[in-house]
């Protein structure tokens, strides 16, 4: 259950990270409220997941999901670079997440 909650927390991290772009420095109300809510949910779920997972593993997986998810969103939605080096780097992060899961 902790792993499932951690993945959901990571997905909410993607929501708030992407949401920051839409807040325009927190000058737009609705995107700002959505972003703030996503931050609260992400942190709350991360804290809950940490009750059943080692702190280092949980934090590394959470940031990995957020980083890769946000970068993939940027490639798909904002047309950011999808170079070989960038994709390889994402694959290494994902491999690290899988390694942490398998070693827990």
Curated annotation (Swiss-Prot):
What ranges does the Periplasmic topological domain annotation cover?
20-28, 78-81
Assigned keywords, A-Z:
Cell inner membrane, Cell membrane, Ion transport, Membrane, Transmembrane, Transmembrane helix, Transport
Q: InterPro entries this protein is in?
A: Small_drug/metabolite_transptr, Small_multidrug_res
Which loops or segments lie on the Cytoplasmic side of the membrane, by the record? 1, 49-54, 101-104
> Where is the major localization of this protein?
membrane
Where in or outside the cell? Cell inner membrane
Its Gene Ontology cellular component terms are:
plasma membrane
Q: Which family does it belong to?
A: Belongs to the drug/metabolite transporter (DMT) superfamily. Small multidrug resistance (SMR) (TC 2.A.7.1) family. Gdx/SugE subfamily.
Name of the protein in its database record: Guanidinium exporter
Organism of this sequence? Photorhabdus laumondii subsp. laumondii (strain DSM 15139 / CIP 105565 / TT01)
